[in-house]
């Protein structure tokens, strides 16, 4: 599933780069939702990070996600795949759009415009959904553990 997230993310980015003009807003639902191509030098949703921090943070997050849950069932596998696939999709952008001397410092292609919310892409959405699902699973596991404790 992680591979599917990367493939869809990169395919959409290729299409977006072909049809959208950087910075120009194309409305879908009035001014509330639309397309707007931007190149993001920061982390998810435009959070600014120095270039060397992002790849290191990506690896740390990937390792943490892969180790965070033991036997989680299908939902845990899906959540982990979403986070890993999203992280790899954005990391691919950094590598593909790298500049000489900074092999991981390329720009990430973002294109979903939703009001004043920072622009994002399929990879960002996958990471967000995966993290939320992981948090829900962790909360449910904590509840189960408390329920097993003698009163």
Regions found by a protein language model. Give the residues of each.
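Alpha-helical transmembrane bundles and membrane-interface segments of multipass inner-membrane proteins
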Residues: 1-151
